[in-house]
């Protein structure tokens, strides 16, 4: 009898145009598309991930960043085991808004493990990430840097999310 592969739901949240969909596509499909189409509501993809604990299937939920989708998003947070709060290194307000995103998610799942992700590293290679690190320290989580364009840090980010999700599932 084959063992069932656990499905772990994770969410990718942040303002519009920070690169959430691009990160997911880079990870799941291995590609980057220059053209941007805003996510309407939510979207999701799945990917098998091999961890030290065994294989898991990540169900990666892409949350639309526009304010008008807030009420809808809250329903989709349920059942999540981890979240990435993504900001654009070239857009400081997207980092400031992560506080709002965290609050919105915590309203639904108070103890959800999260990671702060600085995206678009390729556009700002010398940009200091101290403010992102300060936020991550303040909320007691990790801070990672990624580039959906080059792929830098993307696999590490999703592996970290998968490990957070496995840990959360075990403690629930």
Regions found by a protein language model. Name each.
Residues 35-44:
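Short beta-strand-centered segment that lines the nucleotide-binding/catalytic pocket of NTP-utilizing
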Residues 2-13, 17, 22-30, 45-172:
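Ras-like small GTPase catalytic G-domain
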């Amino acid at each position: 009898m084959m063992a069932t592969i656990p499905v772990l739901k994770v969410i990718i949240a942040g303002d519009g145009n920070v690169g959430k969909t691009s990160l997911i596509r880079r990870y799941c499909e291995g590609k980057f598309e220059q053209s941007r189409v805003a996510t309407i509501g939510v979207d999701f993809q799945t990917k098998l991930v091999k961890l030290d604990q065994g294989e898991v299937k990540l169900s990666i939920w892409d949350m639309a960043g526009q304010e008008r989708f807030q009420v809808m998003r809250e329903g989709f947070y349920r059942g999540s085991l981890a979240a990435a709060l993504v900001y654009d290194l070239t857009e400081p307000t997207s980092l400031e808004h992560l506080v709002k995103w965290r609050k919105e998610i915590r309203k639904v799942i108070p103890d959800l493990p999260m990671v702060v992700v600085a995206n678009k590293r390729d556009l700002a290679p010398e940009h200091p990430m101290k403010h992102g690190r300060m936020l991550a320290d303040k909320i007691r989580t990790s801070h990672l840097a990624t580039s959906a364009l080059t792929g830098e840090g993307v696999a590490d980010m999703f592996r970290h999310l998968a490990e957070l999700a496995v840990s959360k599932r075990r403690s629930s």
